[in-house]
Design a protein with these regions (language model features):
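Aliphatic-rich helix starts adjacent to a transmembrane/signal segment
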Residues: 3, 15-78
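Residue-level detector of short, conserved catalytic/binding motifs and their immediate flanks
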Residues: 19-22, 132-134, 196-198, 208, ...
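Extracytoplasmic beta-strand-rich oligomerization domains located immediately C-terminal to a leader/signal peptide
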Residues: 53-216
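Short linear sequence signals and composition-biased patches located at protein termini or domain-edge surfaces
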Residues: 57, 64, 74, 80-106, ...
Length: 311
């Protein structure tokens, strides 16, 4: 059988053709555009993720700072069954001269014992402080407290002797309680004096932030703890209560005063702390991630005298 051959006319088939230079250029340009879009999308997502992570970290730092401030406020003035808001300086039997007035039980008041204080300069070397610091003091159980931080108290008196108190008999002697008075034994507490200060400022040319300073075993400020970065201002306001109704004053309510002025003669019922970063603080170089104000509200134990909440 004869095969039929396909006759292709001359000039009718030139073979397979490749891409032209123009087509290569167009394809390459499209590839570059796609690559730029992918890279841009990646870096945008990375930037947003970094900003979100940094914002989350700062919010967590602020929440931790709020927890510490609220706890210190609730503990302020408490030394066992002795509460500073119920006593005057006459109930402080003995106190050695402190390295800083802020470490004294009497504070600046000439009558009432005030468990919180303000200070424009806490006196920590190298620290540039902005506005006033907020200071709390109280006692925590510690039988091995150093001589500089030992505090002994009963329900009616307190002493910071400047030495360790190893026995109950020594504690009763400091508090001028007769050794034969056994009924007072359960009221006597041997504690460590805690003084915590919160201040906004900076060290050298470093960034400003909120720092916490604590009284150490040597009776000095210990190493500061950075609680939150980028904080530039701490505004503290106080809540004072007055006009407590008597039992026969039916329908009468106590009066609350909300003020930014600290009264060194009256224990406030509460404090409000506003932490602010200012309008020029940015997160992860993103102009739309300004750190806004953070408000902390805390009550002071024994401050609301109308409620008689001293325990």
């Amino acid at each position: 059988m004869k095969r039929k051959m396909l006759n292709v006319p001359k000039g009718g088939y030139d073979g397979m053709k490749g891409f032209t230079i123009v087509e290569f250029l167009v394809a390459g340009l499209l590839s570059v555009i796609v690559l730029i879009a992918v890279v841009s999308s990646y870096f945008t997502s990375r930037k947003l993720n970094d900003a979100a992570n940094e914002r989350l970290a700062i919010q967590q730092d602020l929440r931790n700072a709020a927890t510490l401030i609220v706890r210190d406020a609730r503990m302020a003035g408490s030394f066992g069954c002795f509460n500073m808001s119920e006593h005057t300086e006459k109930d402080v039997f003995f106190g050695v001269t402190q390295k800083k007035p802020l470490f004294s039980l009497k504070g600046n008041s000439t009558n009432k014992l005030i468990p919180i204080a303000e200070s424009p300069n806490i006196g920590y070397q190298g620290f540039t402080q902005r506005l006033n610091a907020l200071i709390f003091q109280y006692g925590i159980d510690d039988a091995n407290a150093s001589a500089e931080t030992t505090v002994v108290s009963s329900c009616g008196a307190i002493s910071k002797p400047g030495k360790q108190i190893p026995t109950l008999e020594d504690a009763k002697k400091e508090l001028k309680i007769q050794d034969s008075d056994k009924e007072q034994n359960g009221n006597i507490a041997r504690q460590r004096h805690v003084v915590n200060a919160y201040a906004v400022g900076r060290f050298g040319n470093n960034e400003e932030g909120l720092f916490r300073f604590q009284l150490d075993d040597k009776g000095e400020w210990g190493n500061p703890q950075l609680l939150a970065k980028k904080v530039k201002r701490m505004d503290v306001r106080y809540i004072y209560v007055s006009g407590c109704p008597e039992d026969e004053d039916a329908g009468k309510e106590e009066q609350f005063k909300y003020t930014g002025k600290f009264d060194s003669f009256v224990t406030p019922a509460g404090v409000e702390v506003l932490l602010d970063s200012g309008s020029d603080a940015k997160i992860a170089a993103s102009s739309d991630n300004i750190i806004y104000a953070y408000r902390i509200n805390a009550t002071i134990r024994g401050g609301n005298v109308c409620a008689n909440r001293t325990l």
